[in-house]
Amino acid sequence: MPIRTHPTLTIAFFMAVTTTVAATATLFPESTFARVPIAELKGRKKNPAPKPTPKPSTTPTPKPGELQPFFDTIDIPEAISFPRGKAVDVTPKPPEVNAFDKEVLATCGEFGSSVSTSQIRALFAKNPAIVTQISNAVGGNLTPLRGFATQKPSPTFQEDLVQIWTTRSGFEHILCGQIKGTNKIGGLHFAARYLELQQKGIAGRLPNNQRQEEVNPGAVYTLGVQAKVNGKLVSDRKKGYSYVSNAQEILTDGTRAYKAFNINSGENNSVCLYSIKDNQVAQPFDAVFVKNDRGIITFYPDATPDRGERRCDQDAPIRPMTPTP
């Protein structure tokens, strides 16, 4: 028996469908959907997850051509040769520079230039209080010293001081730094000189040299140096300075070591260890002192000295030494 369709129900059903279609068109107009070809949809990839924003580095990165600083105000511990197993800051805050330090720097002049005996004589003559202090530290004279007596000591302590610091260019080597040949830096063991060279954009810390670096925090800093000289970079992998020694203290300690190391070495270089005591550091530290009968050759702090080396106040047979920094 055929199913009968009630006319009223048919009309109601048709009206319901029409209403639903109209409502759908209103909620989702045709422009809502982008018309994208099927082929393009198949070639699309999912959007990658956003990468995390990297944290800013605390280590200042020099721009190309810039020199790395010797000193800064940021504590950046690094793993270096010494101390082993402990990261330390190789670039401490800038050292204090006093009036006499500035006079010494002025005497040094441009990096790599020579310092004459007359310049050092003038420096001492201008600073009699410094000379008196050094004189008092060594008992008022540099004699009797074996070997020194043959040089006919000068009538004044000041002139003797000039001689021991100039005859082997010790003043220039230690306090100013030298350029040897075309690619080597000699000496350079005065913290204020490092600061001056940094501020003038002349020299900086040698990068990627951690295996050669040694630090006794707050006291001794041994590091590589690169410097701009005559339009090119000159470098040395191992230089160093005492952070707590100003120019007057270097001259005083060096003169003390010269007199205490009472040995007749003639023209041969003799080496000893000198203990530096300073109230800014908890423990004394050693400095390597080198001289011959003519004068002071070099004087620099060492974080890892040869403990078997003779002390400056002890007599010992002369033995060959390695080239000085």
Residue ranges of model-derived segments:
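Low-complexity, intrinsically disordered/propeptide-like segments
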Residues: 12-18, 30-31, 44, 226
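Functional cores of ribonucleases/endoribonucleases
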Residues: 35-43, 47-90, 94, 98, ...
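Low-complexity, intrinsically disordered tandem-repeat tracts enriched in small/polar residues
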Residues: 12-26, 49-61
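Non-Sec secretion/translocation targeting segments of pathogen effectors
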Residues: 1-2, 19, 323
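Bacterial N-terminal signal peptides that target proteins for export
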Residues: 2-15
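Signal peptide processing junction and immediate N-terminal pro/mature segment
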Residues: 20-41
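Short non-domain terminal segments
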Residues: 11-12, 26, 31, 283, ...
